[in-house]
Every structure is written in structure tokens, then in C-alpha cells.
């Protein structure tokens, strides 16, 4: 993470933390060990540990926030901002247009951030697949392409289950949909791909 280490911008907080970078790449080995029982119980324990870690880490960047339950939204938005800074881009909260309030606007794109923990169960992440339809008007409203940034468990699910990011699950049929979205100014982006480009 050479570019991160050499960047002196004090607004880059989360991405300087080794555990954050590990988490983004799906390495949760920094979590404390648990007494193993079975997969269901173990995942419940890991979910608690992951949430405790996430709230603590997010609090480092935003000590003003009360993070009783949900931490992934703010965490993801701040990762997005820090990535913009590392790429030399300016960012801001975009103006609300019609009923849209995207997460971030950079020099060259509107950014919507989708973050999920690695131990979230169920189908909550499947909402990510509806983003191109939900936000179809954003590229024309803002005159910029929409990039849907997927990070953490969301990136893993998109790559390994849903196939809307590059990987074995991205079939030719799914690729055709992704090409259509891109032709209409909407693209899914894996945060780890951005991080790798910054090495």
C-alpha cells in the first residue's frame, strides 16, 4: 500500500489501518479466536466480533457517531472518500435530485457504496443487484457515470455468488447485462480492484 503510506493527508485514517485493508480483502484473521462449536454458532460469534471491530474502527474516523448497531454504511462511505483522496480526486456529498441522494460525488463519477459484513446471513446483499434499475436516472441527472462500489462481504458475494463482479460466477449472460449497464453509465466496481491499482 505504497501510495497510502506516502500520502500525508490527515483525512486518510481507515486505509492506514492494516486490519481495515485485511478486512477489505476478506482476511479476518485479526479477529480474536473463538471456541469452535459448529458453523452456525461459530458464525454468530464471528458476526458479534466483526461488528464490535467495525464499530471500534469506524469510531476512530468518526468519534462523533453513535454506532449502536449499524456501522457499515458510514464505514463504507468513508472508505470511498479515502479512496478518492488516494486517487487525487475531490469528492463531496452530491445535491439531492428528485428523490436521489447518492453517497458521494467525485470529479468523474457519482458513487453509491454497498458494504456488508462477512458474517451477515440471509439475502440482504441481493439488493445490490437491483441498483442499476433503482438508480437508472442518475447518470443523466448528474451528467456523470454511476459507480456502485462493493466492499467487504458485499464484494465477496458479488464476485463469488451473484456474478456481477469479475469471477467464475460472471457468466456470458450476466456479462451481457453488465455491458448494457455500462453502456448506460452504470458500473459495479470492486474496492479491492481500486486498492490493487494503488500499489
Please state what every model-predicted region is.
Residues 100:
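Beta-rich catalytic cores
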Residues 147-199:
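Domain-level recognition of nuclease-like catalytic cores that cleave nucleotide substrates
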Residues 1-93:
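Acidic-basic catalytic patches of nuclease active cores, encompassing PD-(D/E)XK
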Residues 115-169:
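Catalytic cores of nucleic-acid endonucleases
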Residues 104-117:
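Conserved catalytic cores of phosphodiester-cleaving nucleases, focusing on short active-site segments
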Residues 74, 78, 132, 172-175:
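Residue-level marker for well-ordered alpha-helical positions
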Residues 84-85, 139, 181-182:
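A generic structural signal for well-ordered alpha-helical segments
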Residues 91-94, 188-190:
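A structural preference for short, hydrophobic beta-strand core positions in alpha/beta folds
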Amino acid at each position: 500500500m505504497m501510495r497510502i503510506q506516502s500520502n500525508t493527508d490527515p483525512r486518510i485514517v481507515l486505509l492506514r489501518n492494516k486490519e481495515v485493508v485485511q478486512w477489505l480483502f476478506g482476511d479476518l484473521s485479526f479477529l480474536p479466536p473463538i471456541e469452535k462449536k459448529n458453523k452456525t454458532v461459530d458464525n454468530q460469534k464471528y458476526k458479534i466480533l466483526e461488528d464490535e471491530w467495525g464499530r471500534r474502527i469506524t469510531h476512530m474516523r468518526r468519534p462523533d457517531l453513535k454506532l449502536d448497531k449499524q456501522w457499515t454504511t458510514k464505514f463504507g462511505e468513508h472508505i470511498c472518500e479515502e479512496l478518492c483522496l488516494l486517487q487525487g480526486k475531490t469528492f463531496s456529498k452530491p445535491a439531492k435530485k428528485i428523490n436521489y441522494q447518492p453517497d458521494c460525488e467525485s470529479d468523474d463519477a457519482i458513487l453509491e457504496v454497498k458494504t456488508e459484513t462477512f458474517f451477515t446471513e440471509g439475502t440482504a446483499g441481493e439488493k445490490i443487484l437491483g441498483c442499476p434499475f433503482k438508480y437508472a436516472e442518475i447518470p443523466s441527472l448528474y451528467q456523470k457515470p454511476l459507480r456502485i462500489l462493493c466492499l467487504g462481504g458485499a464484494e465477496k458475494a458479488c464476485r463469488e455468488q451473484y456474478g456481477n463482479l469479475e469471477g467464475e460466477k460472471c457468466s456470458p449472460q450476466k456479462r451481457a447485462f453488465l455491458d448494457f449497464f455500462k453502456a448506460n453509465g452504470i458500473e459495479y466496481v470492486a474496492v479491492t480492484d481500486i486498492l490493487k491499482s494503488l500499489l
